[in-house]
Amino acid sequence: MLLRNGKILSYLNLTLTAAIWGFAFVAQRSGLESLDPFTFNALRFALGTLCVWLVRKVARPGDAPARTDCGTTFTRKGIRQLLLLGLLLFCASSLQQTGMLWTSAGSAGFITGLYVVFVPLISLLRGRKLSKALLVSIPLAVMGLWLLNKDVGLNANLGNGLVLLGAVFWALHIQLIDRLTQLHSSLDIAVVQYAVCTLLSALVAFPVSRAVPAWNMDLAELLQGIGQATVPILYAGVLSVGVAFTLQLHAQKKTAPEVASVILCLEGVFAMLGGYLILGEEVSLMAATGAVLLLAAMLATILGEGRGHFLIDKKGKPKF
């Protein structure tokens, strides 16, 4: 079994995405100290939209759809799907960011990573068959996530419930990306979904900030809050949105969503690593064991995908 260079690059892109997202949980939690969830998301996705739009202006022709028979124009159906992708991104990011008001970054990281379960469940509903490698790696990943976050103190509270619902939307988002990256360039998809998420976040931020006294700020207070959250906004906007989400889009052109979800849940490992390197947090033996299991799940998935057991229907054709 020999993996092609394109596959290897996709795996590296997904791993880098997981690393950026892992460190982003701390940034997102810090941003909530100064801004409400929707204003924070509106600002970071606006920044991400701007970054990707600028890159798109100078992008090389290599940023093309995975399929060569679909052209470059947007159909009405394609536009509706892109708008739906932006809506899913808005729902997922809003639920996650709002949930973090009542839960820790560690809890949010663990619960969000449960999309590794939801993605293959959705695939089964779509009529796909999971390979033996995935049947092994998914339980490994769940066990690894649990061990990695065993000490965070999960409770059945509102915050964890919102983040869990967000994980379902993240799974739907990953699944729809699987289809759209076959039909459109990753930069086109990125600009549209980020812009939609920015607009929806801004539209919700205004009435919500007026309804919640703690978030009701005048212009001077808002500018002060933005100033205090500058670093989290820059990290979450430029790196988490502009770089990581776009890398995910590019990588999923050649990677099945089930495989992508296993690799992306490595964000929990990088969150732990960031806490150790930056915040000086201790890493328990249990957490280290969880990290090893997550790495094992990723390797099992990658080796299994090399056998070509994904994205094939009963007639042997690609299934979208």
Which ranges hold each PLM region?
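C-terminal-most transmembrane helix of multi-pass membrane proteins
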Residues: L3, F45-A46, W53-L54, V58, ...
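Specific alpha-helical transmembrane segments that line the substrate/conduction pathway
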Residues: T39-L50, Q97-R128, K132, G166, ...
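Hydrophobic transmembrane alpha-helices of multi-pass small-molecule transport proteins
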Residues: V52, L130-K150, A167-W170, S201, ...
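Loop-to-transmembrane-helix transition segments
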Residues: L9-T17, P65-Q96, L158-G166, W215-V243, ...
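Glycine-/small-residue-enriched transmembrane alpha-helix faces in small-molecule transporters
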Residues: M1-A42, L87, C91, L95, ...
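Specific transmembrane alpha-helical segments of multi-pass solute transporters/efflux pumps
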Residues: A24-F25, W53-T112, L147, G237-T255
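Hydrophobic alpha-helical transmembrane segments of multi-pass integral membrane proteins
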Residues: I8-N13, T39-L54, V58, L134-L140, ...
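Helix-helix packing/entry segments at the starts of transmembrane helices
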Residues: A18, L43, A108-L114, I177-L199, ...
